[in-house]
């Protein structure tokens, strides 16, 4: 990645300069508005800390959830501002709007080392607009917040890896208006993904889970030609099992993808590995009674909610000799203790391979959440990404708009 980085910016000097940082602070909240996994907040700290300590006037923009282009109190960044302040060890102001009168007044009142978090950027419909001119108008308003008193432009730091695959105002368009730099997180993430795609030590094992084949089809197609083993679990495995002619009971099934899965199994028979046993239940609930059955013997009326111990053993054998591992997507409903063993077992196998020298990447999203929820050591993996969708699109071979614009 031939872009300027945060280190370059710090070397130039940021004392007294306005710096707009696009962070990824899209954290999960419970019904009471409490953050249940602060991973992304923690990951954003190094860049923000470095800028604040260097005397920049730091303005942070980020989103939370999917508001419909207007303010939604349930998706306010207020709890994030509090958590961010705690992690930074300094007060973080929260603007009452995105680029309105409160944001402007607070931006003008910043002193060196201050941090201001703008309200949820997706409260403004222009952020995600397909209309270039609408996005650009929001980008100009964001750029104006970091303009110097003498009219000199501020700078933009892209540090939200989880959104770099989106062509949005705060990710792409604002970078066309301001001097731009990759933050610590974005630079590290891209370096890891480049290592995965360019200098892969073999055997290379890919572990894919999650619910829908359609969401992972492009990455399956791409990685099946590169990996030595492609392990498939999670809800998506049932469409593959159906493609083998097995009954999957009331398990999650994408019938429209069965023929595609059959073709993939034919083309990559030596690469794709499916579960040999499944943990089933008669309902999707934490208190459901679990039963392990052979993968080709799922009873009618039962749904698969995890891979079984035989599958964990089989996948562990494949992973034990791997030199490179990419994992995206849980093996089962890890949020329910009765259906978490598959995800935990596979994760422990990856940790074991890492301990023997393998390079392992956890591809963000639910996988990263599972690592934390199941109490697994985060340093047991070489890298835990903050961007599931961005990681997958990169590995599909797609251009990421938020990275592409930094290279210009």
Curated annotation (Swiss-Prot):
Catalytic activity: (2R)-3-phosphoglycerate + ATP = (2R)-3-phospho-glyceroyl phosphate + ADP
GO molecular function: ADP binding; ATP binding; phosphoglycerate kinase activity
GO biological process entries: gluconeogenesis; glycolytic process
Major place of residence: cytoplasm
Entry annotated with the keyword Protease: no
Superkingdom assignment: Bacteria
Cell compartments where the protein resides: Cytoplasm
Subunit comment: Monomer.
Protein name per its UniProtKB record: Phosphoglycerate kinase
Species of provenance: Mycolicibacterium smegmatis (strain ATCC 700084 / mc(2)155)
Gene: pgk
């Amino acid at each position: 990645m031939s872009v300027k980085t945060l280190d370059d910016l710090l070397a130039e000097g940021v004392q007294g300069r306005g710096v707009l940082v696009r962070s990824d602070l899209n954290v999960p909240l419970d019904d009471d508005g409490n953050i249940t996994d602060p991973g992304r907040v923690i990951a954003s700290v190094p860049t923000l800390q470095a800028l604040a300590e260097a005397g920049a006037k730091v303005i942070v923009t980020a989103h939370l959830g999917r508001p419909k282009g207007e303010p939604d109190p349930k998706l306010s960044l207020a709890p994030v501002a509090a958590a961010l302040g705690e992690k930074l060890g300094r007060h973080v102001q929260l603007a009452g709007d995105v680029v309105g009168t409160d944001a402007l007044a607070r931006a003008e009142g910043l002193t060196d080392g201050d941090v201001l978090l703008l309200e949820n950027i997706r409260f403004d419909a222009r952020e995600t607009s397909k209309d270039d001119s609408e996005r650009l108008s929001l980008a100009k308003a964001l750029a104006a917040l970091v303009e110097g008193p003498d009219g000199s432009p501020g700078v933009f730091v892209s540090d939200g890896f989880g959104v770099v695959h989106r062509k949005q105002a705060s990710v792409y368009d604002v970078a066309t208006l301001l001097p731009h730099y990759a933050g610590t997180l974005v630079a590290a993430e891209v370096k890891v993904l480049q290592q995965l795609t360019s200098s892969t030590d073999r055997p290379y094992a890919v572990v894919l889970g999650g619910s829908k084949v359609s969401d992972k089809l492009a990455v399956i197609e791409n990685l099946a030609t590169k990996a030595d083993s492609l392990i498939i679990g999670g809800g998506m495995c049932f469409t593959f099992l159906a493609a083998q002619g097995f009954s999957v009971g009331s398990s999650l099934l994408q019938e429209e993808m069965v023929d595609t899965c059959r073709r993939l199994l034919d083309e990559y028979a030596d690469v794709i590995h499916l579960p040999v046993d499944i943990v089933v239940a008669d309902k999707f609930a934490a208190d459901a009674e679990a039963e392990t059955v052979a993968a080709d013997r799922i009873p009618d009326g039962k749904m698969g909610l995890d891979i079984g111990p035989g599958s964990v053993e089989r996948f562990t054998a494949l992973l034990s000799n791997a030199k490179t591992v990419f994992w995206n997507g849980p093996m089962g409903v890890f949020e329910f203790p009765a259906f978490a063993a598959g995800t935990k077992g596979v994760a422990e196998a990856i940790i074991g391979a890492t301990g023997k020298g393998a390079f392992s990447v956890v591809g963000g999203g639910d996988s990263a959440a599972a690592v934390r929820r199941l109490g697994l050591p985060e340093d047991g993996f070489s890298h835990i990404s903050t961007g599931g969708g961005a990681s997958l699109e990169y590995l599909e071979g797609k251009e990421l708009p938020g990275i592409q614009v930094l290279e210009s």
